């Protein structure tokens, strides 16, 4: 198989996967409310959902490394189907919470599986393309998948395409489509990401019998490696900043629109533009990397410091137009180094613990996000959203300096870091 064929297969699979995820994004909170949940109960459900993912992230990453990444991914699809089916029948808080646990577990099972699979397959194929450029193409497809899924997910409840007497709300059609699409993706993935390909091309590695041992080994490496340590530390802060901005931009914009006769379509438009901006950032990251002579650490450092400066500006906006421009510019700069950070992480990790390391990275984002939801939410309530964003900007700028600690020779494009 050629590099181009592998990229095409994986990008298509990821676009399909994330389009299914996008189906629930526009209506998730509305769906919970139709189950009789108030905002406090919804907060409990979301904390349980995220907490389940965080708790299972690392051990299930070790499971994928030991028992097969493609098989583990398929298990995540089955768990998604089960969780969505239970949510379809849930009529009280307890059943919704159980469904949230299943869906959180599905996210944890998925974390790092196919990403690690693709990296190993890509490195085993000779070709001129770099992993960074391949990742940029894939992330563009992921973004378009999310955008398409979100658009369809927002349209489905009003479409009236399907309605059964046992359905509890108009939003249940989204769950039906998620279940159907996940079953279809199970079948399609057998062709796009075959287990046989992994068996033929992957190098056999000694595998410890104890999953906890695998997790401890990966954790130890992540906090002692000259590249992985700053990457993980900054990833924690990245999760905090991302959560702070995503949780607070809607109420901030609502205040700006309070004197205007604007509907919710403004929020939808800005969200759609955000997806397009993220795709543009991923595409341009390859060219921008060449400006830094292939140094991933410098690309990340400069783009994150610049995004921190823009976040300060976002806290000062007072008009819709200025808010939209600065908000989109922030996310363009904030995501510009995402591919480079993934390269540093992947290249620094031994193949036999790659899924585990990706799960640890995802865990850092989750933990940072959970902490930010509580801490920055409190600050926003008592001191204002602008203050929260300014503090987040300071944290982002300070943590970005950690990339300067990475040895220059280990942050070059195409350099093996293991």
How would you name each of these model-derived features?
Residues 78-92, 96, 305-318:
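C-terminal ends and interior cores of transmembrane alpha-helices
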Residues 101-142:
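Cytoplasmic helix-loop-helix junction between adjacent transmembrane helices
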Residues 2-55, 88, 227-274:
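Helix-loop boundary and gating motifs at the non-cytosolic
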Residues 43-47, 54-58, 62-65, 70-71, ...:
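C-terminal transmembrane bundle of multi-pass solute transporters/carriers
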Residues 1-5, 193-233:
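Juxtamembrane intracellular "pre-TM" segments in multi-pass secondary transporters
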Residues 169-171, 178-206, 405-417:
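Helix-loop junctions on the cytosolic side of multi-pass membrane transporters
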Residues 30, 34, 146-174, 251-259, ...:
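Transmembrane alpha-helix termini and helix-breaking/packing motifs in multi-pass membrane transporters
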Residues 15, 83, 94-110, 321-336:
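Hydrophobic core of transmembrane alpha-helices in multi-pass small-molecule transporters
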